[in-house]
Every structure is written in C-alpha cells, then in structure tokens.
Amino acid sequence: MHTLHWWAVQAVDKEDAAAIVESVVSEEYVDWSDWYVVGGGRWSNSQYENSHDMVISYDEEPEKFKETIRGCIQARMDEMTFIKDKIDINKFVNSVEKYANFGTIGDDRFGLQTYYVRKAGTMLLEYYNPDSYFYDIIHHSASTDYIYELIDKKDSNGLFLVPVDFHY
C-alpha cells in the first residue's frame, strides 16, 4: 500500500528541503516502510525518482502550505473515525480480563480488537506511523502543533513541506 506524507523542514530552498528529507528518511526515521520516493512518487510526474517538484514553500504559498497540513489532519481524523467504529469496547475489555485471569485472550486471539486499539493508541500518542500523513523534522514529531506555533510566531522563514510516497 502507498501513502503520501508531507514532511515539514526548514531549508534554504526547495532542492535543499528535498535533500534534507531524503537524508533523514534514508538514515533513521521510517521503520514501517520498505520503499519510498521523496517528492511525491506516484502523486507526481517523477513516480520513481526523487524530486523537488511538489515541495511547498510557506514563504511562497502560505495558504497552500496550511491547506496541505489541514488535509493531513483531516486524513488522520478520517482514519481515527474508521478505527473508532471498529473498536468494540466490551470485546476489548473481555480480552483484557481473560488475559489478566488466564494469561491468554482465548477465542478472541484472532480478532482485531487489540489491533485497532493499538492503532488508536499509536495515533493518540502521535507516534509517526503510516496513518500520520505528516512529520515535522524540525521538532522530531508527528504533531502539527509545533509548525503552527512557528507560523503564529512569524518564525516561518524557510519552512517547506516535502511530499514523500511511502510503501508499506
């Protein structure tokens, strides 16, 4: 499955922003992906090659920058709504009680309750994951709050959003 994520970074220009993201992605951050293209991948004209074509500069396009982040937030909200609808609290609590009492969850071991609760927890803790859609290199966080703080403080010089097509 492919997912488009937007990485926030401070850089000199679009090329520098894409290069910084490429360096960080390749070195350390993404343990859930087996393949990626910086620059948008299948969402761009450079499907298999790293590029800076889709990079968004806050200085040049502040509304598009903020709209893109809002899109990431909406995608998270949609994912959480899907997860919420899948979680059956009674089944989950029953599994917890069985495990606490017997060391196993019994017949529910192939159910997806714990999977969805784990996904919800990962998102609520703002751990970077396939459903984050956004990552802030500057603050090492999947939270969008810090970027908005920079914008609010008028400290947005050299802010860029770099698209990354991840496969997982």
Residue ranges and their predicted role:
Residues M1-G40, N157-Y168:
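Short, extreme N-terminal segment that most often corresponds to the first beta-strand
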Residues M1-T3, L125-Y168:
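Acidic, proline/glycine-rich low-complexity IDRs
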Residues V12-A17, E61, D88, S143:
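Alpha-helix capping and helix-coil boundary motifs
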Residues S26-F134:
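Low-complexity, serine/threonine/proline-enriched polar segments
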